[in-house]
Amino acid sequence: EDVIMVTDPAYGPVAGTTDTLQMLRKIWPSLKTARMIGSSALSISYVAAGRMDIFVHHRLQPYDQAAGLILMEEAGGLVTDREGNRAQLYSDGLIASSSIIHQQFMEITKHLQWRKPSSRSLNPRER
């Protein structure tokens, strides 16, 4: 494929880093390349602009994704959590892409630990 993925395994040895690396290993044959830009907001913006094809992240803070959610929606893209539900500010993980690429990604990763929800909510009202 000619798919360019943007991701970031997060800083340091945090929960989800190993799962992200496992996900990359599984999806690598379907990619042209993968990039780590270092800014989730910029990465999502690149997907919205069509410069990259898919952005995935295990766990983001609301401030990391707020602008990207709007940009992707306005660009006609699809943004979901790791389970495939429409993304919200406190979503558990993020997948941003076109609907076709999203469907392919979800199929390839359906049995991976990366797709399972985290036990800790990011929403301060639920802690």
Predicted regions and their residues:
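An extended, acidic
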Residues: 1-127
